[in-house]
């Protein structure tokens, strides 16, 4: 039995592989033609047009609202409408909601809130559904989707002004503490959407209010803007001695992951948590504004550019070429012919750079010729999440598709200017001067960067250039201040910490932060498309699976689309939430950022993200797991169509899925945040063989995604070896063209790696010690501090009033015998000392 041809090879069959002399020569043209046709097909399959994607805080308003609901919930829209209309007819005669004056609408809402305060769960649920119908835009009285969105926003502001959010917050506390619902869900073999009805209604109302009020528009009246700021303050700070709202949602996430509440609608919880954090702390553009303000407060020079605008102006690069596998090597001309071509061509060219010389040395040599290393399993350094879930697959990586590049030497065309201003750190200048002084004068001057005596003129010019591009980050200032506070705690006094929303959130999360991070990563792992179904993994489909499983094929297809969409939305919310937390904590204080980062790394976040990208990212980004006719608000205006193959396949004609591309970019940004300037974590990227995984993501022609992939490749380039750099020159050129340069950063060569053995464990331990010292100094307030003043006056101490517990007099004689009479006391010496 003949072995099947290797996947992706273009070699001829057994009779044309070179065996048998003349037969092989006769079959060569056919084999070459077959290889060319296969190559054309593969080029067409991987060709991706430039994606017109605009990165932002979130998707469009309608899309963000529609993702709140699963398609299984669509039948509940009519249920909400019926509950509202039944209640409305008993209170208002002969009018519809939109016909009422604002005062009458407010009076009706007050009546609804009063009717929520009943003992019966069924009656309470009906009234809550009526409130949800208002928040959904009273779609029964609207003619278009625009009207539904308009009245949804109007009603949400009205509901907030009447105190609906605080009322629903109390109901949410009751449902979270409802032990009967938890025990009922635990007893069931399979939890379905029916087990979380009350929670889904409450969370939906709260999400609609947060999302609609969060959205700012120029036409908003003054009252709405005031209400928005008041709402933001209520969500940010502890009200009535209660924790901030985000902490309540975090506790729901941990309770769900611990298995104590499997019926929680986790998608709605995560969406609401993400939007609350974004609303209270600010989105990505607001972060840039805060960064500019903070630099001005610290007396630092302004930023050289706005990173968001620079990325938006970038153009996507063509993906690098890939291996042509066995077919190319079989059909390539003999080396002697190549040498002849190379020699004749060199006679015509007098000046060539090293890249052109390298390309001409072997015209058929494309990137990644040695695929043995990259085709090894990405799970060689296999890790587990909480000891139960594999984080790296053991299946071999899929070989890269054939090259798109023509079989000729290519020249790399660089733009006129690089997009980023180069940066230099203070320690880079110190390191440069240390090497220069050792070379020219034989000794060093420590951290002195001003004394240049004895150094040649070119070194003077180099130092001048380095200082012109010196960049002092906010983190550098914060670390320096922290070192001074550790050295001189008494003389510098107590640090004044402003009570910002970010600071309050960190204080609330501090002691449970490891559990929060592990819970989020567990859910992210369960939602990743590369995850394998396991019996011991958490069930994230409780709020999407119907009570009765589908019977027909079409119903199964619909549920399959719904489940995939459900997972995509969870990935989107978690990735954006983690990125927002990291960026805000980094701006607030660098050690807050490092604390969160370290717990993410300890929970195996790095291999988890790499596992996510160990799939066909192009297919994931272009996946169409949506049914447009079932999306809100479209499904509320039109009658639900009969389930057919056409209605399932009917959807938007966009070339990509916004949320999936958004998730991929955020996960790459998250990975970049965790590994930047951390050699131990960069080595994790190398150990887990991330280079081929990341490089395949470059096939997606979107500038921002490519930028963060190239950043991650740049981090580990020096560790990948000379052969990898030689065979990936186009990737190296793309890094040079798109990623910011650090002067005297030897990223492309790695000459000093062997001379610099990193103690990775010591690096993380030192960072952890600094974090613990920061948290202890700022947030631990022990009563008997070593820095608190001591009262040495005997009379003063004896005269102090000491509050004793009420039951102390029962054991007073025993205490007197044990602590006073049985202890030898030299009274003369005691009196002499005082």
UniProtKB/Swiss-Prot annotation:
InterPro entries: Far11/STRP, Far11/STRP_C, Far11/STRP_N. The keyword Phosphoprotein applies. This is Striatin-interacting protein 2. The lineage of its organism: Eukaryota, Metazoa, Chordata, Craniata, Vertebrata. It comes from Homo sapiens (Human). Residues 369-379 have a biased composition (Acidic residues). One of its GO terms (biological process) is cell migration. Belongs to the STRIP family. Plays a role in the regulation of cell morphology and cytoskeletal organization. Required in the control of cell shape. Calmodulin-binding scaffolding protein which is the center of the striatin-interacting phosphatase and kinase (STRIPAK) complexes. STRIPAK complexes have critical roles in protein (de)phosphorylation and are regulators of multiple signaling pathways including Hippo, MAPK, nuclear receptor and cytoskeleton remodeling. Residues 1-48, 321-345, 360-382 are annotated as: Disordered. Part of the core of STRIPAK complexes composed of PP2A catalytic and scaffolding subunits, the striatins (PP2A regulatory subunits), the striatin-associated proteins MOB4, STRIP1 and STRIP2, PDCD10 and members of the STE20 kinases, such as STK24 and STK26. Interacts with CTTNBP2NL.
């Amino acid at each position: 039995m003949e072995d099947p041809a290797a996947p992706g090879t273009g070699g001829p069959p057994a009779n044309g592989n070179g065996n048998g002399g003349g037969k092989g020569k006769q079959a060569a043209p056919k084999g070459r033609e077959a290889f060319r046709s296969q190559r054309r097909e593969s080029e067409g399959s991987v060709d991706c047009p430039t994606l017109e994607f605009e990165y932002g805080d979130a998707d469009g308003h309608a899309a963000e609202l529609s993702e709140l609901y699963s398609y299984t919930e669509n039948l509940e829209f009519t249920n909400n409408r019926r509950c509202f209309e039944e209640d409305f007819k008993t209170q208002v005669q002969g009018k519809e909601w939109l016909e009422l004056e604002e005062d009458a609408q407010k009076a009706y809402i007050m009546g609804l809130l009063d009717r929520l305060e009943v003992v019966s769960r069924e009656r309470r649920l009906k009234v809550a559904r009526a409130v949800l119908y208002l928040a959904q835009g009273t779609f029964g009285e609207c003619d278009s989707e625009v009207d539904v969105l308009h009245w949804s926003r109007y009603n949400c502001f009205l509901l907030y002004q009447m105190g609906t959010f605080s009322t629903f917050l109390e109901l949410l506390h009751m449902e979270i503490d409802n032990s009967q619902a938890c025990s009922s869900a635990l007893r069931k073999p399979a939890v379905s959407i029916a087990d979380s009805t009350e929670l889904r209604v409450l969370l939906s109302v709260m999400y609609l209010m947060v999302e609609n009020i969060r959205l700012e528009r120029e036409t908003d009246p003054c009252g709405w803007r005031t209400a928005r700021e008041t709402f933001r303050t209520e969500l940010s700070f502890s009200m009535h001695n209660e924790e901030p709202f985000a902490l309540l949602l975090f506790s729901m996430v941990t309770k769900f992951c611990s298995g104590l509440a499997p019926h929680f609608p986790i998608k709605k919880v995560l969406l609401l948590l993400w939007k609350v954090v974004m609303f209270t702390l600010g989105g990505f553009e607001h972060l840039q504004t805060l960064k500019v303000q903070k630099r001005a407060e610290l007396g630092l020079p302004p930023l050289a550019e706005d990173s968001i605008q620079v990325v938006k102006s970038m153009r996507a690069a063509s993906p690098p070429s890939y291996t042509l596998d066995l077919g190319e090597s079989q059909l390539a001309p003999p080396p002697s012919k190549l040498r002849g071509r190379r020699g004749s061509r060199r006679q015509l060219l007098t000046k060539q750079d090293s890249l052109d010389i390298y390309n001409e040395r072997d015209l058929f040599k494309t990137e990644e010729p040695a695929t043995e290393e990259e085709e090894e399993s990405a799970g060689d350094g296999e890790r587990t999440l909480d000891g139960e879930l594999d984080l790296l697959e053991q299946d071999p990586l899929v070989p890269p598709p054939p090259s798109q590049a023509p079989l000729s030497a290519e020249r790399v065309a660089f733009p006129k200017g690089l997009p980023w201003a180069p940066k230099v750190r203070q320690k880079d200048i110190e390191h440069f001067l240390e090497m220069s002084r050792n070379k020219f004068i034989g000794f060093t001057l420590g951290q002195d960067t001003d004394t240049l005596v004895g150094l040649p003129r070119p070194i003077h010019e180099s130092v001048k250039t380095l200082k012109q591009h010196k960049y002092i980050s906010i983190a550098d200032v914060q670390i320096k201040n922290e070192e001074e506070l550790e050295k001189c705690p008494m003389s510098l006094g107590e640090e004044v910490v402003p009570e910002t929303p970010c600071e309050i959130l960190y204080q609330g999360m501090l002691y449970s932060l490891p559990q929060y991070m592990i819970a989020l990563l567990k859910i992210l792992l369960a939602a990743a498309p590369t995850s394998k179904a396991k019996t011991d993994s958490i069930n994230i489909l409780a709020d999407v699976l119907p009570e009765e499983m589908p019977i027909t094929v079409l119903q199964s297809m619909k549920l399959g689309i719904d489940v995939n969409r459900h997972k995509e939305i969870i990935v989107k919310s978690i990735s954006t939430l983690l990125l927002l937390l990291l960026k805000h904590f980094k701006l607030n204080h660098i050690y807050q950022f490092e604390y969160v980062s370290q717990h993410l790394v300890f929970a195996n976040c790095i291999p988890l993200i790499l596992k996510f990208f160990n799939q066909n990212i192009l297919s994931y980004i272009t996946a169409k797991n949506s049914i447009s006719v079932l999306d809100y608000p479209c499904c509320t205006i039109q009658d639900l169509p009969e389930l057919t193959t056409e209605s399932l396949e009917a959807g938007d004609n966009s070339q990509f899925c916004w949320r999936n591309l958004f998730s991929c970019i955020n996960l790459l940004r998250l990975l970049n945040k965790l590994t930047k300037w951390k050699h131990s974590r960069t080595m994790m990227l190398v150990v887990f063989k991330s280079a081929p995984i990341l490089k395949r993501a470059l096939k997606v022609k979107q500038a921002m995604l490519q930028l963060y992939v190239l950043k991650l490749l740049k981090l580990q380039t020096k560790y990948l070896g000379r052969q990898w750099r030689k065979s990936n020159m186009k990737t190296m050129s793309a890094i040079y063209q798109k990623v910011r340069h650090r002067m005297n950063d030897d990223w492309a060569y790695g000459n000093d790696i062997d001379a610099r053995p990193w103690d990775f464990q010591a690096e993380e331990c030192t960072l952890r010690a600094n974090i613990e010292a920061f948290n202890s100094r700022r947030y631990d307030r022990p009563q008997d501090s070593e820095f608190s003043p001591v009262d040495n006056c005997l009379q003063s101490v004896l005269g102090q009033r000491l509050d004793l517990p009420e039951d102390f007099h029962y054991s007073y004689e025993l205490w007197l015998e044990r602590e006073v009479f049985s202890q030898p006391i030299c009274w003369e010496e005691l009196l002499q000392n005082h």
